[in-house]
Amino acid sequence: MINVAVLGYGTVGSGVVEVIEKNKDMVNKKSAQELEVKYILDLRDFPGDPYENKVIHDFNTILQDDSVTIICETMGGVGAAYQFTKQALELGKSVCTSNKELVAKHGPELLQIAREHNCNYLFEASVGGGIPIIRPLNYSLTAEKIEAVNGILNGTTNYILSKMEKEGADFDTVLKEAQDKGYAERNPEADVEGYDACRKIAILSSLMFGKNVDSEKVPTEGITKITAADFEYANAAEYTIKLLGRSRAIDDDTAEVMVAPFMLPKDHPLAMVYGVFNAVFVTGNMLGDSMYYGRGAGKLPTASA
């Protein structure tokens, strides 16, 4: 029996519980052990929820329960999430997370703590939602010298740019529509100013180069200045506009990392990624180009990762 605790019962946290419960037989078969959600940590109560009896409010309950060996952190932020993750790893409990802000800021430290205490700190869900990209960079492409990573890493901005291109609409109109549909937050700053994509490309760059890339030092520009006229100009030249996180090796010790809107030829694979979908385009010195594509956000895709 593997007992799991889920930290946070919002969109992603409830998705994690749903994935584990719905795919329980398959997960148990693949892991050769029974997987069970024992605790759900949240400040709120959830009367009437199918799993309300698992909801607790004190993290110490999880820390003091030796039967809990895996923790799924879906809280977000770098305050309590950092403290809880650090405490869990120091007790030898493995942690997996969707928290890109935490990984971007404290990832190297938390990975080191995990190594020292013979457990794992896993963050596949922190970049690209359900797209498998962390493991490919870490394991599948071990023999590759990664020369560049270019990615559409934020579904909100890709949805907005796709609608602006197809309908000739202005930024503010499409943003409001995205908010009405739930694709954009009421405060969309992290998305539209590029901060979300910045944290993600910093994580990918750190894996790519084997050294920490500080997201706060990555030059970042969002999409708020893009206009319908920009798309008219791009279309006339057979180009489109995408917000990309870009990381390029200049030499063994130097990399160029940035987030900004770029013009792409319409026959480029990334130019064909529309709506809320994400994609990561990886260039290796032996493999050449490969692309990883899928839903970059959402309850179940992120929970699946």
Identify the role of each PLM range.
Residues 139-193, 197-199, 204:
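Conserved anion/nucleotide-ligand pocket segment
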Residues 7, 73-75, 98, 105, ...:
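Structural motif
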Residues 94-96:
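A short hydrophobic/small-residue beta-strand
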Residues 81-91, 100-138:
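Rossmann-fold NAD(P)-binding glycine/threonine-rich loop
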Residues 1, 6, 269-305:
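ATP-dependent carboxylate/acyl-activation modules
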Residues 175-272, 277-279:
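Substrate-binding/catalytic subdomain of NAD(P)-dependent oxidoreductase enzymes
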Residues 1-91:
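N-terminal glycine-/serine-/threonine-rich beta1-alpha1-beta2 phosphate-ribose binding loop
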Residues 76-78, 154, 264-265:
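Short glycine-rich anion-binding loops that position phosphate/pyrophosphate groups of nucleotides
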